[in-house]
């Protein structure tokens, strides 16, 4: 599957080019609804360099198609997420992940 994108709220303007620094708010859940991460709960957005492999492949591909101000649901298959290894004892092996991501800005 890779990454499936469902737009929740339309954004405006351009999409971020590969190599840009993007700032997002996100909430990550398992398909059973268990929340495993939330930048809003921490009160701080998350920054990363798009396309540099700093995040899972599903994020690099999904966020690259978003516009500033857009909020989308990214449904990410295990091969575009953490795969057979899972992550940090929180994400089980071969888990499909669901992220609600808001692209705040890029530069």
UniProtKB/Swiss-Prot annotation:
Cite the InterPro entries for this sequence.
FKBP-type_PPIase, PPIase_dom_sf, PPIase_FKBP_dom
- Activity control: Inhibited by both FK506 and rapamycin.
A single Gene Ontology MF term assigned here is: peptidyl-prolyl cis-trans isomerase activity
Official protein name in the record = FK506-binding protein 1
Could you tell me which Gene3D superfamilies the record lists for this protein? 3.10.50.40
Family listed = Belongs to the FKBP-type PPIase family.
A cellular-component GO term for this protein: cytoplasm
Question: So what does this one do?
Answer: PPIases accelerate the folding of proteins by catalyzing the cis-trans isomerization of proline imidic peptide bonds in oligopeptides.
- Give the originating organism: Dictyostelium discoideum
Asked whether the UniProt record includes Amino-acid biosynthesis among its keywords, one would answer no
Q: Which UniProt keywords apply?
A: Isomerase, Rotamase
The PPIase FKBP-type domain is annotated at 19-107
Catalysis performed (reactions): [protein]-peptidylproline (omega=180) = [protein]-peptidylproline (omega=0)
- Domain of life, per lineage: Eukaryota
Q: What Enzyme Commission number(s) does the record list for this chain?
A: 5.2.1.8
Cited Pfam families: FKBP_C
User: Does this entry carry the keyword Isomerase?
Assistant: yes
């Amino acid at each position: 599957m890779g990454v499936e994108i469902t737009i929740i709220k339309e954004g405006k303007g351009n999409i971020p080019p590969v190599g840009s620094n993007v700032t997002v708010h996100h909430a990550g859940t398992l398909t059973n609804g268990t929340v495993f991460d939330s930048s809003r709960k921490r009160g701080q957005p998350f920054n990363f360099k798009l396309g540099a492999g700093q995040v899972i492949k599903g994020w690099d591909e999904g966020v690259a198609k978003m516009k500033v101000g857009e909020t989308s649901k990214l449904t990410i298959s295990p091969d575009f997420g953490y795969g057979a290894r899972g992550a940090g004892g929180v994400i089980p092996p071969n888990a499909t992940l669901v992220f609600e991501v808001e692209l705040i800005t890029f530069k």
